[in-house]
UniProtKB/Swiss-Prot annotation:
InterPro entries: 5_3-deoxyribonucleotidase-like, HAD-like_sf, HAD_sf, Nucleotidase_putative. This is Putative nucleotidase OB0422. Its EC number is 3.1.3.-. PANTHER family: NUCLEOTIDASE YQFW-RELATED. GO terms for molecular function: hydrolase activity.
């Protein structure tokens, strides 16, 4: 039996892309999806000609809708997590989502059939605080989309994998998940 840890946003679910479509509707702007797929940073507001402050405000004003509506799950992600659980492995979720949204996030995951134990769900920390939680759990594998998070874990025994995103393609030091369907066959 092994312990698997997963970030949620932009690792298991397409949160930024979901936000992109919400922004298009709210701002009544049509932006080519290819521009989104070429972004070299996490934040998406520049695609809509918003400055940092306006982008932060747009994100905060849209947060409930972004987090708790019909955000798509990456193809194969749910199946991968369910198969790992079925094989007897422990599943942990470690997300930097704010404490205010933790319980609702857990409920959303369950509604979408992700296996979630209360004791295996961690939220409300900053990205740089994830390291302490992940180290304390002594995970065998951890998957995240942010190189800055994974960089803090390179001296641990945890096998680190990065979920492919346009903003992390310059990071070559981690095994990369492009397609969740390939995860079980190729990464273990």
């Amino acid at each position: 039996m092994m312990k698997f840890g997963f970030d949620i946003d932009d690792t298991l679910i397409r949160l930024r892309e979901h936000a992109f479509h919400i922004y298009q509707r709210k701002l009544n702007q049509q932006v080519d999806i290819e521009k989104f797929h070429q972004l070299e940073r996490v934040e998406i507001h520049e695609l809509f000609s918003l400055n940092e402050q306006e982008g932060k405000q747009m994100w905060e004003d849209s947060l409930e809708e972004i987090y708790f509506t019909d955000c798509p799950i990456y193809p194969g992600a749910l199946e991968t997590v369910l198969q790992l659980e079925e094989l007897g492995h422990e599943i942990y979720y470690i997300t930097a989502r704010p404490k205010l949204h933790g319980e609702q996030t857990k409920a959303w995951l369950r509604q979408n059939e992700f296996p979630v134990l209360d004791s295996h769900f961690f939220y409300g920390m900053k990205d740089n605080e994830k390291m302490e939680i992940i180290q304390g759990l002594d995970l065998d594998y951890y998957v995240d989309d942010k190189p800055t998070v994974l960089d803090t874990l390179t001296k641990t025994n945890t096998k680190l994998l990065i979920k492919d995103q346009s903003y992390n393609r310059n990071k070559k030091s981690f095994a990369r998940i492009i397609d969740w369907h390939d995860f079980l066959q190729n990464k273990l």
